C-alpha cells in the first residue's frame, strides 16, 4: 500500500512522530497544534507500513465527539478497515472489556447499565433502608460522593476505612448497600465500567495478559 500520502501536509515534527519506528512515545503539544492529525496518521502508518492489524489498534478519547472525529479521519486514510479498530472513549472500551470479563466478578456478560436518574433513586432507596433522613442526606449529594470514590478507585470496604464523620459513615453504608443492590440486579453504573475493569485487570493476571496482547 502506498503510504506516502500519510506524510503529506505534516510539518517536520509531526512527520517525525508519525513515521517513528514502532514503540512507545509521548507527544506533547498545545491546543490546535494537530495532535489528532498526528495520532490518526500514526495509526495509518502503523497499519499500512508496519504490519499492525487494524484489530490490534486501540485509540482512546475522553469524549464521543472526539472518537467520532478520529473514526472519520481514519476512514479517510484507511477506508472500511477502521471498523475493526477500537476507536472509542475510555468508558466504551472498558465496557467492551467488561462484557467479556464480567463473569469473573459475579456478573453475567449481559449486565445492564443504570442511568444517572436511576442511580440517584437507588441511593435514595438505600438511605431509606438505613433509616437516614433524605433531607439531611440528599440522595444526589451522597451519590456524588460515591461517584467520586469510584473515580478514585476506592471501593466500599476501603471507603469505610476512611470515614471521619457521621456523614462519611452514612455514605460508606449507602455505598455498600448500593453496590449490593446493583450486583443483585446484574447491573453496573457508569463509574463501575472503569473501576470494575481495573479490578479485573489487577486481580486476574491472565485477563491482563490477554488484553495486553490484544493491542499493539
Question: Which residue ranges define each predicted feature?
Answer:
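Post-Walker A alpha-helix
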Residues: 39-40
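Walker A/P-loop
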Residues: 36
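A basic/glycine-biased coupling hinge at the interface between accessory DNA-binding modules
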Residues: 1-5, 22-25, 30-33, 44-215
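Pre-Walker A adenine-sensing motif
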Residues: 8-19
Amino acid at each position: 500500500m502506498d503510504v506516502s500520502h500519510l506524510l503529506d501536509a505534516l510539518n517536520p515534527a509531526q512527520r517525525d512522530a508519525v513515521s517513528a519506528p514502532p514503540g512507545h512515545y509521548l507527544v506533547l503539544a498545545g491546543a490546535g497544534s494537530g495532535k489528532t492529525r498526528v495520532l490518526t496518521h500514526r495509526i495509518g502508518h502503523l497499519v499500512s507500513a508496519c504490519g499492525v492489524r487494524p484489530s490490534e489498534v486501540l485509540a482512546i478519547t475522553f469524549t464521543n465527539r472526539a472518537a467520532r472525529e478520529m473514526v472519520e479521519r481514519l476512514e479517510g486514510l484507511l477506508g472500511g478497515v477502521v471498523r475493526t479498530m477500537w476507536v472509542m472513549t475510555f468508558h466504551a472500551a472498558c465496557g467492551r472489556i467488561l462484557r467479556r470479563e464480567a463473569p469473573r466478578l459475579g456478573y453475567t456478560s449481559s449486565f445492564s447499565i443504570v442511568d444517572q436518574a436511576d442511580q440517584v433513586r437507588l441511593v435514595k432507596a438505600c438511605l431509606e433502608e438505613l433509616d437516614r433522613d433524605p433531607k439531611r442526606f440528599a440522595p444526589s449529594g451522597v451519590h456524588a460522593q460515591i461517584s467520586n470514590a469510584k473515580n478514585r478507585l476506592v471501593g466500599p470496604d476501603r471507603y469505610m476505612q476512611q470515614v471521619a464523620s457521621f456523614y462519611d459513615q452514612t455514605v460508606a453504608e449507602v455505598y455498600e448497600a448500593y453496590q449490593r443492590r446493583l450486583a443483585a440486579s446484574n447491573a453496573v453504573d457508569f463509574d463501575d465500567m472503569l473501576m470494575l475493569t481495573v479490578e479485573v485487570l489487577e486481580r486476574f493476571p491472565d485477563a491482563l495478559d490477554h488484553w495486553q496482547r490484544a493491542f499493539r
